[in-house]
Amino acid sequence: MFVLSGYEYFLGFLIVSSLVPILALTASKLLRPKGGGPERKTTYESGMEPIGGAWIQFNIRYYMFALVFVVFDVETVFLYPWAVAFNQLGLLAFVEALIFIAILVIALVYAWRKGALEWS
């Protein structure tokens, strides 16, 4: 009988999780269509010929809104499992979550005071 300890399972998972993307990328490279003409290298704009240059500058405020969104989206990802297991975690986990939320509220107030949330 062959018995695996915890490290062999980890090693097997590491090998499989490394081989799957490598095999998928290799298969896609081998099976993709080769060549193509100049039509393949043009940008796609709703089936119409592109007009003008593609290098336009976006307002920096788009990036600020996106950054604030990502911060609070990550907050949700961290707080959801905590809320699901709230009854089993105890007081220490509650205090840690409050500290985490307080840091994010301070970051929100800082972004608000700096004008990152205003569009003018």
Curated annotation (Swiss-Prot):
GO terms for biological process: photosynthesis, light reaction. Signal peptide: none annotated. The keyword Translocase applies. InterPro entries: NAD(P)H_OxRDtase_bac/plastid (IPR023043), NADH_UbQ/plastoQ_OxRdtase_su3 (IPR000440), NDAH_ubi_oxred_su3_sf (IPR038430). It is an enzyme of class 7 (translocase). Its EC number is 7.1.1.-. Disulfide bonds: none annotated. The keyword NADP applies. It is found in: Cellular thylakoid membrane. It comes from the Bacteria. It catalyses: a plastoquinone + NADH + (n+1) H(+)(in) = a plastoquinol + NAD(+) + n H(+)(out); a plastoquinone + NADPH + (n+1) H(+)(in) = a plastoquinol + NADP(+) + n H(+)(out). GO terms for molecular function: NADH dehydrogenase (ubiquinone) activity; quinone binding. NDH-1 can be composed of about 15 different subunits; different subcomplexes with different compositions have been identified which probably have different functions. HAMAP family: NDH1_NuoA. Belongs to the complex I subunit 3 family. This is NAD(P)H-quinone oxidoreductase subunit 3. It comes from Picosynechococcus sp. (strain ATCC 27264 / PCC 7002 / PR-6) (Agmenellum quadruplicatum).
